[in-house]
């Protein structure tokens, strides 16, 4: 969950979670909330308790990838968890003009750094072992790409179901759907945490006219400490605020889901200042009546993430086409004479 040098603990939780926020417990809760939004026929197969438990567990998976500390994985995984929207102006971009393809953004960054090196502070190689300091994060691309992966999973699942896939093939396709659902939930959850959308991700940096905290423990407090202080996450209570999943209207457009992901992140970025203000006003201490007032804000962010995630899952199911290549393969296989080996 944390950006760059921050780390996370991943521990098991139950329905009423007693530790963490957007630590493992928060991501577990967000995936549970998203599951609560789905219709009974979602996916064309039964989301059994075992499947649901796996979806919830996988909400913490991208943070578990930090456990080995290998630089190639850190380089690949770390920037997917955030985007510093303030950096866009350095590249002549706005949220509305972000390119659909992540590596087009990398090219934009590289061109601007070569053309205008004076705009960018020097990078200390000792603090850039994973070579991510030149990047501003890929969170909306990660969300979009996982949506497309889920569409692909549903595509071949539908085709196996309709054109005579074996029970083993169908079961494996269902398991793949569950895996991608769970993992992508992590990134949608990160998008609801305002500190994952900003350069002020762990204490205010630079000009600070409002006197906001500069504590290097602030991110950790919002991710987990405050919820531990205030009794944990009650998923059952928050689920009452979730409405049935809805199809994302523009998802059928080539850049529709990406633009929706960007808009979702921009809306959370607008809450960076209010979040810091809650801290300054003493509403995030977790002590006394005043210190509990920030709980409504953070609970609301979990609900936003769960709702967005449910809508994305539902849309992927509805938008997924049948896999035409697989259809032909299955039809040919099933038309083969008895005794012919099926491949």
Regions found by a protein language model. Name each.
Residues 10-13:
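Hydrophobic helical h-region of N-terminal Sec-dependent signal peptides
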Residues 1-7:
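Bacterial N-terminal signal peptides that target proteins for export
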Residues 16-18:
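N-terminal signal peptide c-region/cleavage motif recognized by signal peptidases
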Residues 20-179, 183, 194-310, 314-343:
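N-terminal, motif-rich segments that launch catalysis or mediate targeting to/interaction with membranes
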